[in-house]
């Protein structure tokens, strides 16, 4: 079996918002990499046995901060690539000088490559469009580094050590705005570090299955299946590895999208022949939420009841030794960053449930090395449907946070129908994958309408569709008026409890994507 971790890159994080992008670009080239805080122990860096090290950007100023790259980085003899802050600290630690720029530079810029024979710029033209994001600049490279690229506002846009495989770029090759950024990453990782491209879906599947078999043996495994991307892919890889040793528990809260519970059962229980226990808990959730209007209270009630029901059912499964979870690599990074990183974490992720306290289960996380895009590709490789893997994000509390105020059975059914029409038309008009997220929101207010000669006094549905790269910011989707008119007409005509449809044109910020 191929050792997919044999050649790897170590990324030291100085707090850049783009650090995870660096890792994703390295992996897209076909090489495994991991992110660790910049102040990780020197012994750890030495024992990690990386083929190369990347120093990320960061929000600090090098000359005002004691945050530097560990000296061990430059003593190991492996290639080093410094990006933005990473370049600045590397140059300064080798006798160069960094000062505040007269003018900050954020956005696209043209750099001129002065030395095309340098390996970091192999297979590239002299002029390159790149993405800058910095307030400081290198003013003196010192005796060890030479300038290999420059721009109008950044005379030192890239550097190379005269004798060692150390390189620095002031711009961000990891962003898509840098036209040939992936080529720069590939040049460093493959050509300079000499990494073999072993990190691919076929090898990952083979490696994961072998690891799961070795770890689990003949033990039984429990998985909380939600129908979301992560738990679905965990179910598929575990089923392929250990077959009927896996039992999935699917808690149907009644707050899912229209027919979603049946679809989950169809894919996993019928088509894939996975042992899935479906718990119809709709009434328990409605009872628990009766009279509750506060969004945060609703979230807590839904989360706690989900865990309670899962625990009840899991306790009935005899001889189970493992609890599988859909933890992915970005969760691992965010969890670590809460304690160690300089990055400002906007939202942390918590898998629903965690380990039930009274159950002596070991944790199994087959996806913890993978980013979301890799999880989706893994799912395709395991035979899961494309539409399941590339669906829009759905909140953990489900429709509970898309029904404003109190949740009632009538409200849930009304929203499910309206939301399904919106989604169906997005697919029909090939717009679904043009937006990042789209859904309906139930407003518990009534509005007068007229259908035929009949006066109607029914509820209002708000449609929400946004375009976003990272969901930290978003713009409202400029969907065609004819399309919105069609969706509105269908909802008002087919969902009897709705008399009016509105479209949300609020960005994030100032609004959030979800209404609650």
UniProtKB/Swiss-Prot annotation:
The GMPS ATP-PPase domain covers 199-391
Q: Ligase as a keyword?
A: yes
Q: Name one GO molecular function term.
A: ATP binding
**Reaction catalysed?**
XMP + L-glutamine + ATP + H2O = GMP + L-glutamate + AMP + diphosphate + 2 H(+)
Q: Which residues bind ATP?
A: 226-232
Query: What top-level branch of life does the organism fall under?
Result: Bacteria
- Entry EC number(s): 6.3.5.2
The answer to whether UniProt assigns keyword ATP-binding to this entry is: yes
The record's keywords, sorted A to Z, are: ATP-binding, Glutamine amidotransferase, GMP biosynthesis, Ligase, Nucleotide-binding, Purine biosynthesis
The active site of this protein is located at: 84 (nucleophile), 172, 174
| Entry's Gene Ontology cellular component terms | cytosol
User: Could you tell me which SUPFAM superfamilies the record lists for this protein?
Assistant: Adenine nucleotide alpha hydrolases-like, Class I glutamine amidotransferase-like, GMP synthetase C-terminal dimerisation domain
Q: Residues in domain Glutamine amidotransferase type-1?
A: 8-198
Name the pathway it acts in. Answer: Purine metabolism; GMP biosynthesis; GMP from XMP (L-Gln route): step 1/1
Q: What does this protein do?
A: Catalyzes the synthesis of GMP from XMP.
Tell me, how does this one assemble?
Homodimer.
HAMAP family referenced in this protein's UniProt entry, alphabetically: GMP_synthase
Protein name (record): GMP synthase [glutamine-hydrolyzing]
Q: Which organism is it from?
A: Francisella tularensis subsp. holarctica (strain LVS)
Q: What is the lineage of its organism?
A: Bacteria, Pseudomonadati, Pseudomonadota, Gammaproteobacteria, Thiotrichales
């Amino acid at each position: 079996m191929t050792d997919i971790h044999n050649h790897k890159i170590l990324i030291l994080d100085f707090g850049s918002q783009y650090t995870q992008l660096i890792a994703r670009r390295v992996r897209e080239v076909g090489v495994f990499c991991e992110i660790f805080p910049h102040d990780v122990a020197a012994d750890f860096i030495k024992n990690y046995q990386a083929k190369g090290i990347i120093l990320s950007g960061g929000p600090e100023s090098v000359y005002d901060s004691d945050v530097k790259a560990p000296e061990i980085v430059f003593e190991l003899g492996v290639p080093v690539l410094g990006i933005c802050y990473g370049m600045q600290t590397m140059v300064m630690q080798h006798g160069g000088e960094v000062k505040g720029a007269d003018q900050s530079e954020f956005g696209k810029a043209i750099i001129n490559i002065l030395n095309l024979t340098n390996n970091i710029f192999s297979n590239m033209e002299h002029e390159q469009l790149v993405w800058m994001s910095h307030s400081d600049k290198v003013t003196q490279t010192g005796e060890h580094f030479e300038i290999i690229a420059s721009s109008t506002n950044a005379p030192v846009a890239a550097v190379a050590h005269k004798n060692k495989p150390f390189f620095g770029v002031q711009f961000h090759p990891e962003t898509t705005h840098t036209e040939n950024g992936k080529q720069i990453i590939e040049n460093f990782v493959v050509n300079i570090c000499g990494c073999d491209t072993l990190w691919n879906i076929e090898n990952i599947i083979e490696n994961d299955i072998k690891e799961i078999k070795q770890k689990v043996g003949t033990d039984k495994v429990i998985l909380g299946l939600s129908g979301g991307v992560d738990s679905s892919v965990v179910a598929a890889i575990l089923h392929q590895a250990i077959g009927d040793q896996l039992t999935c528990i699917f808690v149907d809260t009644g707050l899912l999208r229209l027919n979603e519970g049946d679809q989950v059962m169809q894919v996993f229980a019928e088509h894939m022949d996975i042992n899935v226990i479906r718990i119809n808990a709709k009434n328990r959730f409605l009872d628990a939420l009766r009279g509750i209007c506060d969004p945060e209270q609703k979230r807590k009630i839904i989360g706690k009841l989900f865990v309670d029901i899962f625990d009840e059912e899991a306790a009935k499964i005899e001889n189970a030794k493992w609890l599988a979870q859909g933890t992915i690599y970005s969760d691992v990074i965010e969890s670590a960053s809460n304690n160690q990183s300089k990055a400002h974490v906007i939202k942390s992720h918590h898998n629903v449930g965690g380990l039930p306290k009274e159950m002596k289960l070991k944790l199994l996380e087959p996806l913890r090395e993978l980013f979301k895009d890799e999880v989706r590709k893994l799912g395709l490789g395991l035979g899961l449907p494309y539409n399941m893997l590339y669906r829009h994000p759905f909140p953990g509390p489900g429709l509970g946070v898309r029904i404003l105020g109190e949740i009632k059975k009538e409200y849930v059914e009304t929203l499910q129908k309206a939301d399904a029409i919106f989604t169906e038309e997005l697919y029909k008009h090939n717009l679904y994958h043009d937006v990042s997220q789209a859904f309906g929101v139930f407003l518990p207010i009534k509005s007068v309408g007229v259908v035929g000669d009949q006066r109607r006094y029914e509820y209002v549905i708000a449609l929400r569709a946004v375009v976003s790269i990272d969901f930290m910011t978003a713009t409202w989707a400029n969907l065609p008026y004819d399309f919105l008119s069609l969706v509105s007409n269908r909802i008002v005509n087919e969902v009897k409890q709705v008399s009016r449809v509105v479209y949300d044109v609020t960005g994030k910020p100032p609004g959030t994507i979800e209404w609650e």
